[in-house]
């Protein structure tokens, strides 16, 4: 499918899964659609599963947008509480289109949780409360990482929310990335499990590539395991002359929870920095201009001893302590404070997802998961910016289930192209006019139709129902449609 065909499907208001290989222009198309929506004055929620991906579209993480934070699952009571937060409810109610990028990093349970929050906040039993939902990503990227003692997360396409959205699949097949076409051919060969000895030989030749040593374009070293990353970063830090600045994590609250929180956040318990150190932010702060994954260099320390970080765009940010906390019913159970940085001469392949690097040194000799090689190699724009130290048998393999699902997506995309492209394009602003007219007509007879329920209305509804009033009588009494009355009674668990 071409970008133009996919854009037409998006403009028709369908729920869409947008996918394609590296360089197919997924993010470009999303930005183009976002601009279209803004021109049409359609309120759009711009989100991504990772902070890095969110910055590509000037959005925020879906976790923050939906108010779920670090939650993976939640009880009905907790979901009601999230949906009842005024800020979250208002955001969900005024949004018309929700975009989620980098969805391979979002597991099935979290998508289902977000869907339930949206449904309750918008007071609609339609999937996501009737939002147009646009999911974008590539399941050849690495899946969400499981925390210690937790089961492996289910992939997003196995969620109930995915099944209920009735998604149109838009599989982009054209290559739009500027630069080295050779690396795109290699990535496509790995992606389709059709690579041969010529591909392997070409990657071996990259072992001797000379990468730029200019500090402003410092190349990143990618490893598959954290101990290798830590060792490399400690080695590089030791090479820098000058004094050390040490920052210890401050933990408070329930010790067991604080310890678990320490393992969950990416900031080290003890952070040692020097001027000139390569660092990466490990928390999102959109107001200050950094996200989890933003790279920079320590250019100095301010009068209070906090590190000053120069980003790759030459912007300077003072890295002040950030807070990680666990709450229960607005009560803080544990809280950790630390400078939101870690050393970043080297990072893991998992952490590199969503980044585009000018140059990278990659060690794939210890790959333990299918798809790792594809993710690592797809971080760079060209083979000239790639040095491969080595790779094992696992490095160039892709997940067989993902490969089979990818073939299914291509078939669904072709079906969507034939089905939708022949249809006339509906103008979203015209659709909104139709919706407005419908509401106006409905509210002539039912003045409160589709309005948020108040506590007083709920009390009157319950009293009337328990007094034996019929649905039609309750409808007339409260100025709402019969369907809205039944929906509220179900929500209040008064009827099945």
Where are these regions (language model features)?
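Conserved ATP-binding/catalytic motifs of P-loop helicase motor domains
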Residues: 1-437
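Short, solvent-exposed alpha-helical "recognition" segments
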Residues: 439-441, 489-496
């Amino acid at each position: 499918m071409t970008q133009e065909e996919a854009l037409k499907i998006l403009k028709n208001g369908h729920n869409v899964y947008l996918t394609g290989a590296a360089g197919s222009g997924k993010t470009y198309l999303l930005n183009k659609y976002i601009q279209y929506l803004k021109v049409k004055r359609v309120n759009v929620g711009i989100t991504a599963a990772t902070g890095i991906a969110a910055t590509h579209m000037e959005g925020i993480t879906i976790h923050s947008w939906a108010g779920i934070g670090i939650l993976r699952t939640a009880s009905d009571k907790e979901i009601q509480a999230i949906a009842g937060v005024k800020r979250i409810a208002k955001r969900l109610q005024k949004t018309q289109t929700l975009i989620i990028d980098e969805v391979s990093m979002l597991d099935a349970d979290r998508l289902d949780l977000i869907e339930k929050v949206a449904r309750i906040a918008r007071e609609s039993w339609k999937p996501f409360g009737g939002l147009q939902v646009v999911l974008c990503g590539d399941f050849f990227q690495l899946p969400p990482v499981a925390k210690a003692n937790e089961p492996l997360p289910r992939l997003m396409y196995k969620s109930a929310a995915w099944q209920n959205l009735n998604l149109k699949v838009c599989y982009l097949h054209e290559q739009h990335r500027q630069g080295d076409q050779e690396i795109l051919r290699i990535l496509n060969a790995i992606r389709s499990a059709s690579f041969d000895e010529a591909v392997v030989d070409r990657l071996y030749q990259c072992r001797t590539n000379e990468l730029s040593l200019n500090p402003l374009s410092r190349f990143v070293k990618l490893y598959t395991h954290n101990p290798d990353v830590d060792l490399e970063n400690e080695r590089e830090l030791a090479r820098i002359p000058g004094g050390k600045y040490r920052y210890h994590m401050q933990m408070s609250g329930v010790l067991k929870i604080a310890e678990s929180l320490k393992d969950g956040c990416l900031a080290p318990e003890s952070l040692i920095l020097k001027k000139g150190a390569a660092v990466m932010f490990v928390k999102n702060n959109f107001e200050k201009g950094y996200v989890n994954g933003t790279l920079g260099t320590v250019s100095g320390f301010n009068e209070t001893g906090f590190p000053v970080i120069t980003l790759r765009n030459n912007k300077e940010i003072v890295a002040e302590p950030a807070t990680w906390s666990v709450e229960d019913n607005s009560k803080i159970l544990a809280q950790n404070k630390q400078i939101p940085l870690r050393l970043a001469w080297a990072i893991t392949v998992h952490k590199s997802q969503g980044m585009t690097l000018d140059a990278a040194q990659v060690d794939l000799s210890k790959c333990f998961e299918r798809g790792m090689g594809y993710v690592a190699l797809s971080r760079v724009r060209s083979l000239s910016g790639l040095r491969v130290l080595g790779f094992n048998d696992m490095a160039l393999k892709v997940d067989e289930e993902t490969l089979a699902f990818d073939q299914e997506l291509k078939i669904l995309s072709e079906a969507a192209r034939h089905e939708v492209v022949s249809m006339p394009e509906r103008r979203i602003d015209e659709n909104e006019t139709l919706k407005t007219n419908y509401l106006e007509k409905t509210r002539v007879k039912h003045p409160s139709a589709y309005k948020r329920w108040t506590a007083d209305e709920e009390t009157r509804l319950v009293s009337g129902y328990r007094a034996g009033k019929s649905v039609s009588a309750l409808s007339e009494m409260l100025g709402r449609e019969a369907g809205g009355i039944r929906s509220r009674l179900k929500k209040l668990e008064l009827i099945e």
